[in-house]
Amino acid sequence: MSSIRFIACLYLISIFGNCHEDPYYQPFNKLNITLDIYTYEDLVPYTVDNDTTSFVKIYFKKFWITVMTKWCAPFIDTVSVYTSHDNLNIEFYTRDEYDTQSEDKICTIDVKARCNHLTKPEVTVQKEAYRYSLSSDLSCFDSIDLDIDLIETNSTDTTVLKSYELMLPKRAKSIHN
């Protein structure tokens, strides 16, 4: 365990200059990840493979989605899939109570959407010093929107501490919303 902390400290030193203060640290104990995909491919049937510790994979007829978490105290223990014509909405979230994220472990979330037949190069967008990433080749998708919420919950309150939005293709938000 001490070797992992040493490596994490070296990583923090290389990025932030020291291993004691992480400017992106949030003391969250729940995750909420929402993925909106617009595609012309069939959205049913699908199968879900969830190990409830570090990954969730969802397989569709012509594409698949993988959500990988690394060194996160809260786990994705619930997956909800909603389909409507060309819109796919998937929620990955923490329903149960977990420990608060430790400052000495950097939680990373990596979401990949892959088409069975690649016709375009892979594109990746990232936030917060590469902690959160979304990648896809966009061969069978019109667009992908990913929202990540870091949540703190206790016996009396639930608070969203930080939210991140990643989009493919990368585009500017409309100021007229």
From Swiss-Prot:
InterPro entries: Poxvirus_TNF-rcpt-II_C (IPR010806), Vaccinia_virus_B7/C8 (IPR009176). Residues 1-21 form the signal peptide. Keywords: Early protein, Signal. The keyword Disulfide bond does not apply. Belongs to the poxviridae C8 protein family. This is Protein C8.
